[in-house]
Each structure stands twice: as structure tokens, then as C-alpha cells.
From Swiss-Prot:
Family of this protein: Belongs to the glycosyl hydrolase 23 family.
Enzyme category, top tier: hydrolase
UniProt xrefs under InterPro entries: Glyco_hydro_23 (IPR002152), Lysozyme-like_dom_sf (IPR023346), Transglycosylase_SLT_dom_1 (IPR008258)
Species of origin: Epinephelus coioides (Orange-spotted grouper)
GO terms, molecular function: lysozyme activity
GO biological process, one term: killing of cells of another organism
Pfam families reported for this sequence: SLT
Stated name of the protein: Lysozyme g
């Protein structure tokens, strides 16, 4: 794929905080793999759409599956397609399997398509590609896999919050977003053939 090989991206996996979603007694790559496995049955419902969108945008389908797993647990934590309820706004901040940020003070995107549609997955992939490009421009000295990891972190919290490779997840959800997503993607690639 044109954005780097997900299998060559360094990862420390899920933080303790993220692993507590599933009440795991451990963190790291093992925890990310366990959570990806938990979501794998639901993920199969979306395999053909994921593969189609991956081919269309040059994104490894395993990475799309991993973002879906991390963001919405393959749809399991959504409420009529919505997630990340903001009590201050009295509204949800994110839409669909890939949790596209619709908060006007956040990503400000307009939700496209049904929450589990190929149109929605395409929107998520476009946002990811945009952020990978932003990170490539911001950090031209990083190798392709580092730029991919930075783009994944930026998908979660914007490229303005990525300041260094060593602390790429410093401002991400759980302090581990790109590391968790990469570990899940590696699992989906090797264990489920995405």
C-alpha cells in the first residue's frame, strides 16, 4: 500500500486505560489483540465494504478494521450509529463505525451515509488519507511507517496535536490511540486475513 506497511509499524499496543474497556488484567499488544479478537465476529459483517474502501483509497483493509474496532468496537457501542455523547453540547460528537467527528468545535465534518455504509467508510478513509498527508508534510524526515502512525494519531486528535514521533500518542484518547490501532491492525492482518 502507498501509505506504508502496517506490519512494519512499531507498536506498544493498548494502554492500561484502554485495556480496561474489556476489564483485562494486562495492557500492551496482547490487550490490543484480545480486543480485536472480541470484535472480530461483528467485523465480518463489514468485510466486503472494508475491502472495497481499502482498495479505493489505497488503505490496508486491516487498518480500516482496526480503526472500526478501536472507535466503535465494530458498532457494538453505538447508539443508532452515534457515539461519544457530549453532555455540554447535548449531542453526540461522532458518527458511524469509524466515528467521524461531527462536533462543530472538533472535526466539524458532516456525516455521510448510514453509520455502517460504504459511503461512511469512504468518508473515514478520506479523513485518514488527509491526515497522513498532513503528517507527511509536517514531518518529511519521518519514514513512511512513522508517517502512517502519525496519521493514525492525527485521525484521533488532529495533526496539530502531533509534535514528535516519540510522543505521537501524547494527546490521543487513552494516550495510546495509534499504538492500539496499529496492534489491532496487525492482528486483523495476520489472524483474519484483512
Amino acid at each position: 500500500m502507498g501509505y506504508g506497511n502496517i506490519m512494519n509499524v512499531e507498536t506498544t499496543g493498548a494502554s492500561w486505560q484502554t485495556a480496561q474497556q474489556d476489564k483485562l488484567g494486562y495492557s500492551g499488544v496482547r490487550a490490543s489483540h484480545t480486543m480485536a479478537n472480541t470484535d472480530s465476529g461483528r467485523m465480518e459483517r463489514y468485510r466486503s465494504k472494508i475491502n472495497s474502501v481499502g482498495a479505493k483509497y489505497g488503505i490496508d483493509p486491516a487498518l480500516i478494521a482496526a480503526i472500526i474496532s478501536e472507535e466503535s468496537r465494530a458498532g457494538n457501542v453505538l447508539h443508532d450509529g452515534w457515539g461519544d455523547y457530549d453532555s455540554n453540547r447535548g449531542a453526540y460528537n461522532a458518527w458511524g463505525l469509524m466515528q467521524v467527528d461531527v462536533n462543530p468545535n472538533g472535526g466539524g465534518h458532516t456525516a455521510r451515509g448510514a453509520w455502517d455504509s460504504e459511503e461512511h467508510l469512504s468518508q473515514g478513509a478520506e479523513i485518514l488519507v488527509y491526515f497522513i498527508g498532513r503528517i507527511r508534510n509536517k514531518f518529511p524526515g519521518w519514514n513512511t511507517e512513522q508517517q502512517l502512525k502519525g496519521g493514525i494519531a492525527a485521525y484521533n486528535m488532529g495533526d496539530g496535536n502531533v509534535h514528535s514521533y516519540d510522543n505521537v500518542d501524547g494527546r490521543t484518547t487513552g494516550g495510546d490511540y495509534s499504538n492500539d490501532v496499529v496492534a489491532r491492525a496487525q492482528w486483523y492482518k495476520t489472524q483474519k486475513g484483512f
